[in-house]
UniProtKB/Swiss-Prot annotation:
This is Arginase. It comes from Schizosaccharomyces pombe (strain 972 / ATCC 24843). It holds the Pfam family Arginase. Pathway: Nitrogen metabolism; urea cycle; L-ornithine and urea from L-arginine: step 1/1. The keyword Manganese applies. Mn(2+) 2 binds at D142, H144, D247, D249.
Length: 323
């Protein structure tokens, strides 16, 4: 049996205290413009076809599926800051639509499941959540901090920059992103799984005293204690809504082989699931992102393994339990 296969005995609906009912909106985000490798835009359809809607209906949710095929369409020409960052107008156009879609579904009291796509999409998901829940905290699960500014980014790929927009570090804003704004403070952000940082990211994390738990901390304290520390830091007393943003490259390449920026020494499958279980048990989840699945960066079995991991992240975050 696949380690990600759902069992009929593992049903549990986990409602958020911030929602009125059992609605879940899956927003497919077929987009790979924030980085140079084709394939991430294929992930939402593959995750859907693998059975994500059935998974969540099986848990007892009222599921709404939102397709966004237009996200694959690039603008006819790029913006004025193409030399500063790659595909700025394309990323801006899509993430602005993402913001609006996330906000719209949350306003209807539905938990939002965002399936990417590359992690630049979080420029929109974070701002969309904050538009409805302006005290929401962000638990960022990733091998990378994604906190570079366009100026500090060595690669100029915007999937490494989303949090610099959310935190206001990208100011003065490039013309293409004039619509963005600082929406979170450092005290409402925590990282788990970090193991590959650029110099400026390391400086930001240290100087701004951001809660950043690397794989060293996971090894030293265990995932249970790390999650406890992270959640207590960003959400003391469980009073705030939680936005879980999960880049599958946080997991070890054995667990998530089909992704674009693999780094050895990542989370095990069980460690990843424990994070999701803890968020579900808190009763505070309002949105979950699953990003950077790239089916083209592996053989058929590796693509399936990574797609099934994405499904497991969503199911477990929304309450699937063993007992």
């Amino acid at each position: 049996m696949s380690p990600h296969k759902i069992s009929d005995n593992h049903r549990h609906l986990m409602l958020s205290r911030f929602m009125m009912g059992n609605g879940v909106s899956i927003i497919n985000m077929p987009f790979s413009g924030g980085q140079p490798k084709d394939g991430a835009e294929l992930a939402p359809e593959m995750v859907e076809k693998a059975g994500l809607v059935d998974d969540l209906e099986h848990l007892g949710y009222d599921v709404k599926l939102i397709q966004n095929p237009e996200f694959k369409s690039r603008p006819s020409k790029e913006g004025p800051n193409q030399a500063l960052m790659k595909n700025p107008l394309y990323v801006s156009n899509v993430t602005r639509q993402v913001r609006d879609a996330v906000q719209r579904e949350l306003e209807q009291q539905r938990v939002v499941v965002n399936i990417g796509g590359d992690h630049s999409l979080a420029i929109g998901t974070v701002e969309g959540v904050q538009a409805v829940y302006d005290d929401a905290c962000v638990l960022w699960i990733d091998a990378h901090a994604d906190i570079n500014t366009p100026e500090s980014s060595p690669s100029k790929n915007l999937h490494g920059c989303p949090l610099s927009f959310s935190l206001g570090y990208a100011e003065p804003l490039p013309e293409e992103f004039a619509w963005t704004k600082r929406v979170i403070e450092e005290r409402r952000l925590a990282f788990i799984g970090l193991r590959d940082l650029d110099p400026m990211e390391r400086a930001f994390l240290r100087e701004r005293n951001i809660a950043a738990y690397t794989m060293h901390h996971v090894d030293k304290y265990g995932i249970g204690r790390v999650v406890e520390m992270a959640m207590e830091h960003i959400n003391p007393g469980k009073r705030r809504p939680v936005h879980l943003s999960f880049d599958v490259d946080a997991c070890d390449p054995i667990v998530a082989p089909a992704t674009g920026t693999r780094v050895p020494g990542g989370l095990t499958f069980r460690e990843a699931m424990y994070i999701c279980e803890a968020v579900a048990e808190s009763g505070t989840l309002v949105a979950v992102d699953v990003m950077e699945v790239n089916p083209l960066l592996g053989n058929e079995e590796e693509a399936k393994t990574t797609v099934d991991l994405a499904r497991s992240i969503v199911r477990t975050s929304l309450g699937q339990t063993l007992l």
